[in-house]
């Protein structure tokens, strides 16, 4: 074979390869949208707010029931007076049984008084 025949065959092979590659290319490539179509999308500066309220939970105008909160209903100080008196008497009897003085305050009472004053402000 002459040099010219080899060149023609090589050129023919390259052309055939290019045609096959060009024919298969649109099937295998996932090309992005053209720039003209992509530029038409509006961008909102505050972002997409479609699900803002969806994740915020149920809104209710009524206060939650005590059974749902796991706490007892609100009771006044007058309702609690007998229980508090009973508890105070029990603490005083325990202090007396342990030999502690009832007139001397406990060491942390000063801190407790400061905390109570701060909370009342």
Curated annotation (Swiss-Prot):
A Pfam family: Bombesin
Name recorded for this polypeptide: Neuromedin-B
PROSITE patterns: BOMBESIN
Assigned GO CC terms: extracellular space; neuron projection
Tagged with keyword Secreted: yes
Propeptide stretches in the record: 60-121
PANTHER family, per database record: GASTRIN-RELEASING PEPTIDE, NEUROMEDIN-B
Subcellular location: Secreted; Cell projection, Neuron projection
Gene Ontology biological-process entries: antiviral innate immune response; Leydig cell proliferation; negative regulation of interleukin-6 production; neuropeptide signaling pathway; positive regulation of hormone secretion; positive regulation of interferon-alpha production; positive regulation of osteoclast proliferation; positive regulation of respiratory gaseous exchange
Biological role stated in the UniProt entry: Stimulates smooth muscle contraction. Induces sighing by acting directly on the pre-Botzinger complex, a cluster of several thousand neurons in the ventrolateral medulla responsible for inspiration during respiratory activity. Contributes to the induction of sneezing following exposure to chemical irritants or allergens which causes release of NMB by nasal sensory neurons and activation of NMBR-expressing neurons in the sneeze-evoking region of the brainstem. These in turn activate neurons of the caudal ventral respiratory group, giving rise to the sneezing response.
Gene Ontology molecular function: neuromedin B receptor binding; neuropeptide hormone activity
InterPro entries: Bombesin
UniProt keyword annotations, A-Z: Amidation, Cell projection, Cleavage on pair of basic residues, Immunity, Innate immunity, Secreted, Signal
Sequence similarity: Belongs to the bombesin/neuromedin-B/ranatensin family.
Positions carrying Methionine amide: 56
Signal peptide range: 1-24
Region (Disordered) residue spans: 61-80
Record bears the keyword Lipid metabolism: no
């Amino acid at each position: 074979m002459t040099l010219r025949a080899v060149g023609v065959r090589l050129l023919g092979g390259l052309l055939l390869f290019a045609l096959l590659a060009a024919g298969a290319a649109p099937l295998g490539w996932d090309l992005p949208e053209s720039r003209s179509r992509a530029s038409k999308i509006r961008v909102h500066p505050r972002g997409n707010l479609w699900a803002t309220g969806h994740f915020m939970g149920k809104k209710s105008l009524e206060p939650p029931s005590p059974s749902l909160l796991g706490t007892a209903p609100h009771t006044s100080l007058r309702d609690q007076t007998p229980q508090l008196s009973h508890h105070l008497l029990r603490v005083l009897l325990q202090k007396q049984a342990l030999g502690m003085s009832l007139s001397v305050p406990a060491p942390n009472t000063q801190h407790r008084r400061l905390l109570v004053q701060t909370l009342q402000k």
